[in-house]
Amino acid sequence: MTTFYTVVSWLVILGYWLLIAGVTLRILMKRRAVPSAMAWLLIIYILPLVGIIAYLSFGELHLGKRRAERARAMWPSTAKWLNDLKSCKHIFAEENSSVASSLFKLCERRQGIAGVKGNQLQLLTTSEDVMQALIRDIQLARHNIEMVFYIWQPGGMADQVAESLMAASRRGIHCRLMLDSAGSVAFFRSPWAGMMRNAGIEVVEALKVNLLRVFLRRMDLRQHRKMIMIDNYIAYTGSMNMVDPRFFKQDSGVGQWIDLMARMEGPVATAMGIVYSCDWEIETGKRILPPPPDANIMPFEQESGHTIHTIASGPGFPEDLIHQALLTAAYSAREYLIMTTPYFVPSDDLLHAICTAAQRGVDVSIIMPRKNDSVLVGWASRAFFTELLAAGVKIYQFEGGLLHTKSVLVDGELSLVGTVNLDMRSLWLNFEITLVIDDAGFGGDLAAVQDDYISRSRLLDASLWVKRPLWQRITERLFYFFSPLL
């Protein structure tokens, strides 16, 4: 019996170390950033069992077998659709401004189509303005409405949007609604999901959270897009979830969320429609390719229209493109670069690009909330401040609530607006969307919004920052080490 237990003990020990060695080898064989690999290895060696379970659950990008098969199957028809779209030559821009040229070329070569022109844009800076405009558009819809959100939180004006959507469905408008399972858990636990389905709306719970399948699909891969398409010619996107900030997370101690959305009319709605089509097919298996732009209903104004590229990220989409776009934007800056983000945990490459821009004389400003709803990200963000300040970057800490806007403005002409936070999760993992806009008029509108944010912010004083307590520095460095995993 003693011999039996001895053999079993040695087999357990051998299996334990073989498991650690196997996971270590897998991490080393994967082509990932060195800081990320080192962080995972540290966790595995300090807390082996916890680290191994965490890595198998969250360390690699698993979309799930069924979704991965759908993603592969959809691309032949999607590629044909994109090729057919190229025949609509009147919607594509032939040239761009000097500051936007490199980024638009990158997007065209990675995605296969050029930026689309002739779009009309309107910036909406309050949730009330967004929802009022949306309700009007829903009431005037004639054919179809598609929506996707990370969070839909019942209450306040969000309920008015829901009522208008159900009314549209009852009068014959084809309505589709896709919501992330984790972000919209309150919605799916409320009566609203059933009420909408009873009204004829197709409601899809995207990327369902199922702990029994934790090793088969990465649970923290989320559908983070916020998009609305109406009749294939009106579109919305930006940072706002379908929530009324007067009722959303009021106990978090950060104040109301401050967001920005863009309302668009024009062929950009078609470009966003193909993104939605891909998401819908990956999740449901149903193909809903949008029709090509209709020149009879879309004003392709070459002089006053805005030129836009739509960048989508996530499994099945061009890898690393949003990250490349941000790097290209930073390196294209000649006069000034302004960024707004709620969560700032950049890659080493992006941090280097931002600091280099400041060091070569570009006026670089980053606006982020003073109080953050994520303690982990809040501390990790602070770990980058010293390097940013040393390079000459201005850091503005917004004090008027939780600034949730995600925007970049380069030299007053090149703008990026969408759902992407400047953190690893948005850059490498989630389903995200960003608009790249080449237009000085829109740039002026965005600059006015960013100036308003700055007027409600406090400029971080470098001389005071270096005097912060030692315990804060230690905490910052601790979270900095694990920042590749946040």
UniProtKB/Swiss-Prot annotation:
Q: State the InterPro entries in the record.
A: Cardiolipin_synthase, CL_synthase_A, CLS_N, PLD-like_dom, PLipase_D/transphosphatidylase
Q: Name one GO molecular function term.
A: cardiolipin synthase activity
Active site annotation, chain numbering: H224, K226, D231, H404, K406, D411
An annotated GO BP:
cardiolipin biosynthetic process
What's one GO-annotated cellular component? Answer: plasma membrane
* Domain PLD phosphodiesterase positions: 219-246, 399-426
What Gene3D superfamilies has UniProt attached to this entry? Endonuclease Chain A
E.C. number(s) listed in UniProt? 2.7.8.-
Its subcellular locations are: Cell inner membrane
Q: What class of enzyme is it?
A: transferase
- Write down a Pfam family by its short name: PLDc_2
Q: Which reaction does it catalyse?
A: 2 a 1,2-diacyl-sn-glycero-3-phospho-(1'-sn-glycerol) = a cardiolipin + glycerol
Location (main, coarse): membrane
Q: Does the keyword Kinase apply?
A: no
Q: Which UniProt keywords apply?
A: Cell inner membrane, Cell membrane, Lipid biosynthesis, Lipid metabolism, Membrane, Phospholipid biosynthesis, Phospholipid metabolism, Repeat, Transferase, Transmembrane, Transmembrane helix
Write down the membrane topology: Multi-pass membrane protein
Q: Where are the transmembrane segments?
A: 3-23, 38-58
Q: HAMAP family from the entry?
A: Cardiolipin_synth_ClsA (MF_00190)
Q: What the protein does?
A: Catalyzes the reversible phosphatidyl group transfer from one phosphatidylglycerol molecule to another to form cardiolipin (CL) (diphosphatidylglycerol) and glycerol.
Which family is this protein grouped under?
Belongs to the phospholipase D family. Cardiolipin synthase subfamily. ClsA sub-subfamily.
Official protein name in the record:
Cardiolipin synthase A
Q: Which organism is it from?
A: Enterobacter sp. (strain 638)
Name of the gene this protein is made from: clsA
